[in-house]
């Protein structure tokens, strides 16, 4: 088991894996801890790797290395990666297909290209508008989405984004909205 751990630690780019394997987490950098977590996830040779916020609290250089590692592992091992993140830059960098969630529900699904170029759900559009962009004037204020996120206990029947949406209609408040097929938006008034 130890030799397999060393092999996987080496594969994910941890230097001196024989030494690092005996260290405690606080003795490792954030990037090494993330690599160790990825190595431990690969022990059982999964077909799917669920990566929940894999780049949070990492500097930009280490973040790029972790994304590159996930991409390489996906190709080499035939591994699907389910990436859970709030970082739309990470989504743009690594994802093929995207599911946008709001309040615990999927509100839009599509290819990364379609989601970024032509969002159909008002939340997706507003989410993308909040991203800082280099082509905007420096003094321009960042876009914010008005209102509050629903509490986890709020189990409204309709769209959870309804109170914050400028395109909402009566049906949005009362009726559950289903995603149409594989791609599309769960919205009565899509863009």
How would you name each of these model-derived features?
Residues 10-15, 72, 76:
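Conserved helix-loop functional segments at active or binding sites
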